[in-house]
Amino acid sequence: MNYSTKEFGDKGEEIAARYLEEKGFVIVERNYRCKVGEIDLIAKAVGLLIFCEVKSRYSLLFGQPAEAVDKKKIRHIRRTASWYLTQGMRIKHLYDDYDIRFDVLELIFTGGSKDNEIKINHIENAF
């Protein structure tokens, strides 16, 4: 099945969320947006909170998906994470005792539009 760009991104984020859940994480937020930016997934495990950028591609023709996470994108993600932790939380200081990590999840649909052929590369501490 061929997807629109938005559908493809949404599909990648759904697969990434399931992947993290299988690794023992609980998804706290999906597509968190605030006035300073957006984060694809926010997930937690015991003592760890991760802010995760998801990048999906049909091929590596234009490079690795994570290469699209440039300095500007990193700056926006960090600002958004800071906002989330200090301003956007309904319960402030909820994650004060958690380690914070920034990850990138690369999803490469190696079978083209076939959903059953997906390579996932989880880059922990990506930045």
Where are these regions (language model features)?
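Acidic-basic catalytic patches of nuclease active cores, encompassing PD-(D/E)XK
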Residues: 1-30
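Residues at secondary-structure transition points
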Residues: 3, 7, 11, 36, ...
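Active-site metal-binding core of divalent-cation-utilizing nuclease and nuclease-like domains
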Residues: 26-49
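Structural motif
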Residues: 36, 49-51, 99, 120
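Anionic group-transfer/hydrolysis microenvironments
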Residues: 40-42, 55-57, 105-108, 126
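Conserved catalytic cores of phosphodiester-cleaving nucleases, focusing on short active-site segments
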Residues: 41-61, 65, 77
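Mid-chain, well-packed structural core segment of small domains
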Residues: 67-96
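Domain-level recognition of nuclease-like catalytic cores that cleave nucleotide substrates
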Residues: 88-127
